[in-house]
């Protein structure tokens, strides 16, 4: 985003300045559009990510700390979007290809700056869920819910954490109790008549069916006709 570039560099650098080697200009590598600054070539982007792999985690931490002064709960502006993109567990792992230990280091390095933000705890909870630490995930998701109790995404994450935990443990009695709790929570979300939850209902239905099938197959359960 151009706001981040301007905040960091002000007017010290112009897109038309000769600031790179061999008389090349910034404009040869980046462009400005309605979305802000972006690289002109995907190959350049890939090269930057690969060649700076070891520094990537530190640079993300630096930016997150830098923008933290502008980020607050329920303030959906450009700074909050930057914060969300850089903290999103799925982006860190699948797009930026960071290792799980590096992702965890990022989260805990910015805890002080974002401990009052529900999205921080949500992503930390989803990370712990990804590494199968469902107890830690539950605790972090509860922290997120304590800040934003009516958030659909947070309540969905809590419900699915129970379901995934049930499908992870080997003891049937423990799994049965966990799944029952997660199932009740997920059904409450699915059956809710609130509009903002209605929009995400298909996602919850899909998640519930997926975990239900896994549960039935893992413990060789014969579902009754009502469940089918």
Which residues does each PLM region occupy?
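Hydrophobic/aromatic packing residues within the alpha-helices of TPR/SEL1-like helical repeat arrays
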Residues: 107-108, 141, 179, 186
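Short coil turns that delineate tetratricopeptide repeat
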Residues: 114-115, 149, 194-195
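Residue at a conserved register position within TPR or TPR-like alpha-solenoid repeats
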Residues: 90, 128, 162, 169, ...
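"A position-specific structural signal for the A-helix of alpha-solenoid helical repeats
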Residues: 123, 157-160, 164, 205-214
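TPR alpha-solenoid repeat register
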Residues: 120, 154, 195-202
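C-terminal leucine-rich, beta-strand-based interaction scaffolds used for sensing/assembly
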Residues: 2-128, 134-135, 144
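Structural motif corresponding to the intra-repeat A-B loop/turn of tetratricopeptide repeats
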Residues: 97, 131, 165, 169-172, ...
